[in-house]
Regions:
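Core AdoMet radical
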Residues: 1-79, 92-94, 124-130
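Residue-identity detector for glycine
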Residues: 7, 12-15, 60-62, 87, ...
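Short, Lys/Arg-enriched charge-dense amphipathic segments
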Residues: 55-57, 63, 112-123, 147-151
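Surface-exposed cleft-lining segments at the edges of enzyme active sites
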Residues: 62-70, 96-105, 146-151
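Conserved C-terminal portion of the radical SAM core fold
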Residues: 75-139
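A conserved mid-domain beta-alpha-beta active-site/ligand-binding segment of alpha/beta enzyme cores
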Residues: 135-152
Length: 152
């Protein structure tokens, strides 16, 4: 029998869909994954900060052809910093640089993003390289961008 029950927001975005709040009474803690530290998420995360770990995904491509519905990197960086300033523990935030696009520009964007957070004192990171799922391939083609792994 498990000692603790941990929830995780694997589907959707915890910053946009706050249905996780009402489910917190069924778990001991939760891992929230978001690309958008929205005002409602900000308030809920602060209220429940003792039971949460936040995975803040920031790729450096927010509000671009690749991630049109995601806040700009500057907006998301500022929102994450405000969350910490308001009292959410920095050590409970994992900066997710996900996905990294394996091109010279993509690696440079990922590097600059990580350095920005390192300079502010963040120590927990998670990275992954892009998988070219059909929806990702479609988004690249629609934006007129070359596929990082070629056409095959």
């Amino acid at each position: 029998m498990a000692l603790y029950k941990i929830g995780i927001t694997e589907a959707g975005d915890a910053g946009v869909d706050l249905s996780w709040v009402e489910k917190l009474d069924r778990v001991d803690a939760a891992v929230l994954i978001t690309k958008c530290v929205s005002p409602d998420f900000f308030d809920a995360a602060l209220e429940h900060k003792d039971r949460l770990i936040v995975h803040a995904t920031i790729t450096g491509y927010g509000h671009s052809a690749l991630e049109p519905n995601v806040p700009t990197p500057y907006e998301e960086f500022a929102a994450i910093m405000e969350l910490v300033k308001a009292g959410f523990p920095m050590e409970k935030i994992v900066i997710r640089i996900d996905p990294i696009i394996p091109t010279e520009k993509g690696l440079s964007v990922a590097y600059r993003t990580m350095i920005s957070f390192m300079e502010m004192g963040f120590q927990r990171y998670r990275v992954s390289v892009i998988d070219m799922y059909p929806h990702a391939r479609s988004r690249f083609k629609k934006a007129g961008l070359p596929l990082p792994y070629g056409d095959s």
